[in-house]
């Protein structure tokens, strides 16, 4: 009977751990592998997963494997190669001397001609980098001619069932990025209401 209870308990625990691990893998790239009760907010937690775990080929199983003082996993470029498949794929050195990954155009100085850095995905919310001479580093930009518009892009707008990212082709409203109110002769107007906006031919 004791053996039966032992085996039953072991099986239940194994099932719980297995289910927990399955729930924790938020996506195939595993940018974070612990989900909350609603399955929405993710975090990397070394208590739940072994940051040092390796695959049979010797590579690390998780994109972030270094644990901080709070036992939370951090993404370290010294541990794994950074690339656009990882949620953070630009590396720079922190004050602690370690090299960390970041998804930021600010850390892609050598790649300002490479639009693949900052690709627009859930892993990388900024998908296009442009070198800003005044700031002397790359900044993120949104150009819908580069990628299809969708509701994750800041320049996405839908007007009359038509999707557009161009102020010249859709009716402006206060939800539009180029909508700008100004006052003229005591009257509040918009500079993006067809009357003041450049037309398609301009």
From Swiss-Prot:
Keywords: Disulfide bond, Glycoprotein, Secreted, Signal
Signal peptide extent: 1-19
Coiled coil spans: none
Disulfide linkage: 51-64, 120-126, 149-167, 172-178
Any GO CC annotation of this UniProt entry: extracellular region
An individual GO BP term: multicellular organism adhesion
Presence of keyword Lyase: no
Highest taxon above the source species: Eukaryota
Chief place of localization: secreted
UniProt subcellular location: Secreted
Residues carrying covalently attached carbohydrate according to the record: 41
Function text: Component of the insoluble proteinaceous cement which allows underwater adhesion to rocks and other surfaces. Shows specific adsorption on calcite substrates.
Name of the protein this chain belongs to: Cement protein 20
Organism, as annotated: Megabalanus rosa (Acorn barnacle)
Origin organism lineage: Eukaryota, Metazoa, Ecdysozoa, Arthropoda, Crustacea
Gene: cp-20k
């Amino acid at each position: 009977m004791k053996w039966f209870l032992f085996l039953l308990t072991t099986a239940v625990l194994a099932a719980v751990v297995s289910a927990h691990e399955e729930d924790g893998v938020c996506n195939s790239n595993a940018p974070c592998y612990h989900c909350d009760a609603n399955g929405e907010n993710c975090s990397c937690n070394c208590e739940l997963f072994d940051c040092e775990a390796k695959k049979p080929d010797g590579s690390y199983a998780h994109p972030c494997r270094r644990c901080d003082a709070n036992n939370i996993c951090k993404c370290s470029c010294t541990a794994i190669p950074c690339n656009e498949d990882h949620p953070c794929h630009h590396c720079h050195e922190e004050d602690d001397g370690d090299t960390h990954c970041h998804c930021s155009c600010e850390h892609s100085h050598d790649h300002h001609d490479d639009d693949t850095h900052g690709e627009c995905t859930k892993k990388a919310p900024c998908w296009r980098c442009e070198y800003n001479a005044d700031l002397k580093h790359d900044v993120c930009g949104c150009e819908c001619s580069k990628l299809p518009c969708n509701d994750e892009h800041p320049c996405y707008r839908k007007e009359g069932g038509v999707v557009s990212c161009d102020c010249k082709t859709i009716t402006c409203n206060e939800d539009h990025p180029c909508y700008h109110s100004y006052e003229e002769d005591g009257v509040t107007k918009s500079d993006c209401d067809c009357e003041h906006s450049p037309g398609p031919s301009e």
